[in-house]
Amino acid sequence: MLSFFRRTLGRRSMRKHAEKERLREAQRAATHIPAAGDSKSIITCRVSLLDGTDVSVDLPKKAKGQELFDQIMYHLDLIESDYFGLRFMDSAQVAHWLDGTKSIKKQVKIGSPYCLHLRVKFYSSEPNNLREELTRYLFVLQLKQDILSGKLDCPFDTAVQLAAYNLQAELGDYDLAEHSPELVSEFRFVPIQTEEMELAIFEKWKEYRGQTPAQAETNYLNKAKWLEMYGVDMHVVKARDGNDYSLGLTPTGVLVFEGDTKIGLFFWPKITRLDFKKNKLTLVVVEDDDQGKEQEHTFVFRLDHPKACKHLWKCAVEHHAFFRLRGPVQKSSHRSGFIRLGSRFRYSGKTEYQTTKTNKARRSTSFERRPSKRYSRRTLQMKACATKPEELSVHNNVSTQSNGSQQAWGMRSALPVSPSISSAPVPVEIENLPQSPGTDQHDRKCIPLNIDLLNSPDLLEATIGDVIGASDTMETSQALNDVNVATRLPGLGEPEVEYETLKDTSEKLKQLEMENSPLLSPRSNIDVNINSQEEVVKLTEKCLNNVIESPGLNVMRVPPDFKSNILKAQVEAVHKVTKEDSLLSHKNANVQDAATNSAVLNENNVPLPKESLETLMLITPADSGSVLKEATDELDALLASLTENLIDHTVAPQVSSTSMITPRWIVPQSGAMSNGLAGCEMLLTGKEGHGNKDGISLISPPAPFLVDAVTSSGPILAEEAVLKQKCLLTTEL
């Protein structure tokens, strides 16, 4: 009697305890669905949804799986429910899909409450066939979990794009004031998420501006469907050799993997038999041999547990029926009275064909997209490292510009400095004269030419039109074209000529000093292109190097030794006058460069005095008349041009304390005096710095002709004696 009461009271107490526990579980869940009705025996099922929320459902004790599934679909308001299923774990930790035809209590042994998970059961081969926006949203959530758990392998670039689509769908458009790269670290997209990937996701997110959440989710699915393992349901098996293999169920067939390598594919039409017994799965495949005859191949796989083997078999049957059949197989109502062999399981849901081909009215539904789980934000180290070089480069640029400006303004001083010129050289195209020997039109060169205009707009017109001429030989033209001079516009300061370039040029010109070759008559115009602006400048007869364009003089030449004695004496007188004039004698230039140079350049960039500039602009050349028939008339014209080319400074410069050596004039009786400008070009290069005391290099080709007598040598010597007290300056540029 006592045992009876103990048993009865004990059962009642157990029921009360179970009822209280059920109520606690229902209160813990976010949503509670009472679907048991008036049933006294109630079971509680707790379903975890894809968005992370939980739903608690009360059902009758003998309720089947389809009742629970319908309650969840009704709660979600989901129409395309055939792609989804409820999954649970058994005591052997084997995952199973809840069978809608069987009792929940018989399938799920662990409870109550019975815990299940809503998952995508069949991955659509074409996501665009999904009609409902809610269906696509749930697919995105499932794929996101597959990638995060490592079930679905994803390359780096694809993972970055998919993560950017997730951010666009959840956060909307990128906002510079609100979003920073550290924001990406609050989300988890892949198992191993590096800072490099987060920065790439952040940059990719900016490109998806303007996409709505629905558009971003559609793009996500269209990108994810091309993954190799998309929609593959993997099961680990063992073959006869004892090695581990993986069978992947896909819409097209069964894949066979050895590790990560795909070694085979069995198409559904080629599979004739698929059955199981205990933990062995038998697969019979028909293939054509070389002769075209069908041959059957039998494959046997083993699994660790019989329940896992049956689960694999059921999944294969469902995949074949869903993707290959037009409709589910109807179960026969006649049940055999004999002992049943094998399983009676058949797929009872709709196929993909029925789901996509059935005309359904599109409906406008509203649902709430729940935010993803957030994690603690971390500071990106790569961003700091990436911005430091940029800041450093910007700082360097600023310092370079400031230094360049200081150097540009510092060029006004007389101290010799050689900073790097910030502005690029302006290309000036100098066309070789067609009359120059050894040069053609294809020898045209575009050299960087820098013009110092000395902040005078009027000086440009006076200097460009002041010089004409051509090189005497190919070597001379090449040596002159190798001169690299820097360019500045008015008001920007005078650039400096590199010392090494001037030194090399001076040495080249000095080597060519002794070479004698005939010079042709100069051109009267030259094309000068400055700053890519084609401007044809016709040079006038006003120039520093006055050229007597006379047919008679072009034929008659002065011996080089005569001209050398006279000009050397003039040079010695110039060198000994003042230190300032000696600096001016350093100026390197040629006849071609003088067409564009506006002032004389020296190593220290000392500008010419204002008086000398005015004198340069007021100089008039000697009159070039007709052909001189008499030698005496020619000599008078030459001596007149010599005196006119001398620059007379109005202010007498300070004379150095050193004793002045009076030049010795040697005037032979059988020759004529010339300043080297009779029908040819004269190039004088002064190189006085750095131990070079040779004076001015002279290039004057021979012109063998004789003059009977010198008629005006006396007046010329007297005039030059008077000019000794003034600043003498030759016509060299």
UniProtKB/Swiss-Prot annotation:
Pfam families: FA (PF08736), FERM_C (PF09380), FERM_M (PF00373), FERM_N (PF09379). It is found in: Cytoplasm; Cell junction, Adherens junction; Cell membrane; Photoreceptor inner segment. Residues 43-327 form the FERM domain. GO terms for cellular component: adherens junction; cytoskeleton; cytosol; focal adhesion; nucleoplasm; photoreceptor inner segment; plasma membrane; ruffle membrane. One of its GO terms (molecular function) is protein domain specific binding. One of its GO terms (biological process) is post-transcriptional regulation of gene expression. The modification Phosphoserine is found at residues 39, 436, 517. Residues 29-119 are annotated as: Required for interaction with CRB1. Keywords: Cell junction, Cell membrane, Cytoplasm, Membrane, Phosphoprotein. It is a peripheral membrane protein. InterPro entries: Band_41_domain, Ez/rad/moesin-like, FA, FERM/acyl-CoA-bd_prot_sf, FERM_2, FERM_central, FERM_CS, FERM_domain. Its main location: cytoplasm. Component of a complex composed of PALS1, CRB1 and EPB41L5. Within the complex, interacts (via FERM domain) with PALS1 (via HOOK domain) and with CRB1 (via intracellular domain). Interacts with CRB2 (via intracellular domain). Interacts with CRB3 (via intracellular domain). Plays a role in the formation and organization of tight junctions during the establishment of polarity in epithelial cells. This is Band 4.1-like protein 5. It comes from Homo sapiens.
